[in-house]
Amino acid sequence: MEPPDQCSQYMTSLLSPAVDDEKELQDMNAMVLSLTEEVKEEEEDAQPEPEQGTAAGEKLKSAGAQGGEEKDGGGEEKDGGGAGVPGHLWEGDLEGTSGSDGNVEDSDQSEKEPGQQYSRPQGAVGGLEPGNAQQPNVHAFTPLQLQELERIFQREQFPSEFLRRRLARSMNVTELAVQIWFENRRAKWRRHQRALMARNMLPFMAVGQPVMVTAAEAITAPLFISGMRDDYFWDHSHSSSLCFPMPPFPPPSLPLPLMLLPPMPPAGQAEFGPFPFVIVPSFTFPNV
């Protein structure tokens, strides 16, 4: 004979089919809810990043608002007080991130400023115009050093490299300074020589070129020289009757120097003295 407990369980299993159906329905509803939640999560993951960012921001704002309301309510419930903490933590994190971004920007600016400070002198140097280019530094020699350099220049205008190096070592200057001094001194000497040549050429340019006279004109010339005066210059009244041209005379403002004037002929040879022209022989041959 079976015990009474097993008999009661068997009887209840036979008499309660509706209870099993309700459990199956509850299990089905739970499975459907889990499937819907999974589908929603997949859709949220498939959303673009800006939308996810906005959704996360809205969630953070709502969490912060709930935390603030629960904090204002006095914190009677522990769960409410604990829920308000994450909102403040998120706000603190956001402020910390913003502060960190500001620090990063400040560090970037601090890193850029030294570069700008270093780049300013380069701009100042590179901004020079061609006309304002820096000239090489010229060493200022002492009077004794200048005398020594002049003495060497009078002896040798183009010193060798060995001599320049020895002078630079003895004067405690650079070889470049000695070379520049000799170059400037040679340029000055050339300018002085050109000025002397130009000054000596001016009187010769004022006198003019000699006149070319043929042999026939030279033979007939003494017949017309009787009108020559004692001062060796032609009279204006006789200049028109001569057959050969007169040499040009300088203007009154530029008198000839005494050293360039021709010598005065003696009184007895005034008529047949030396002539201020060149005689060119010319012969004619008879036609055969």
Curated annotation (Swiss-Prot):
Tissue expression remark: Testis. Not detected in epididymis nor placenta. In testis, mainly expressed in germ cells, but also detected in somatic cells such as Sertoli cells, Leydig cells and peritubular cells.
Organism field: Homo sapiens
Record localization: Nucleus
Keyword terms of this UniProt record: DNA-binding, Homeobox, Nucleus
Motif Nuclear localization signal: where in chain: 186-195
Protein name: Rhox homeobox family member 2
Region (Disordered): 16-136
Cross-referenced SMART domains: HOX
One Pfam family from the record: Homeodomain
Basic and acidic residues compositional bias, start-end: 68-80
